[in-house]
Structures are given as structure tokens and as C-alpha cells.
Amino acid sequence: MAPQTLLLVLVLCVLLLQAQGGYRDKMRMQRIKVCEKRPSIDLCIHHCSYFQKCETNKICCSAFCGNICMSIL
């Protein structure tokens, strides 16, 4: 009876991990940092997130109007 109980507890633990989203790959998620320079109000129309990527030579950073794409040059 004890091995069956242990197996049931193990299966329940695995199911609970899946219900919480499973294992998370921290390298896959991009961290959005605060912009190094204060952006102009014109840049506030170019919103981004780690789902919506910015163009080349631009990074997604957090500003007063939300997450925006800002030039790194």
C-alpha cells in the first residue's frame, strides 16, 4: 500500500507543477530595464514588450509612458 501512496503523491506533485505553469526558463524571458536616457514624447508611440520585439539597433526599455523601443546608438 505504501508504494501506491507514494506514487499517487508523486503524480499529484507533477500535476500541480503543470497547473502552475511548469518549469520556467529564466534565460528566455527578457528583462526590461529603465531607459538610460530620457526619451522624447515622440518615442511613446513605439511600444514593445518581450513578445513584441524592437527593430535592429533598438532595445525595449521602460519609460514614463510605458515600454518603448529606443535606439542604442
Curated annotation (Swiss-Prot):
Tissue-specificity statement: Ubiquitously expressed.
Key word Signal present: yes
GO biological process, one term: antibacterial humoral response
Compartments, record wording: Secreted
The organism's place on the tree of life at top rank: Eukaryota
Signal peptide extent: 1-21
Keyword Transmembrane (UniProt): no
Keywords: Secreted, Signal
Domain (WAP): residue spans on this chain: 28-73
Protein name: Protein WFDC10B
Organism classification: Eukaryota, Metazoa, Chordata, Craniata, Vertebrata
